[in-house]
């Protein structure tokens, strides 16, 4: 889950097959980071798990508006698709992994780097976390 404000990866889950618990766990993890008064919009593709009643109900309970891309239109998800492209070129294609567990450990390290250390020109030369922290300090 990526925050459009600063490009920070808020949370993620990984599994060997697409099951609803991956999405529900990710949503629960994101909820723990939110203040009750936060007003949000969550955008996704039209994957079956994002259309399930429990998922939609969880969003409604938190007052979160749901937005879904048009069917078969990757451009509606350009921000996350761009992140995946960056992650592949900076992380996936440059490394070899001995096991799934090794991959998961290295992915966690990369996400931490991406959020805390990797600077972005559009964030005035700051990392996503630095940018968010800076904005909170001057607000």
Question: What is each residue range found by the language model?
Answer:
Residues 1-139:
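Charged DNA-binding/catalytic regions of mobile-element recombinases
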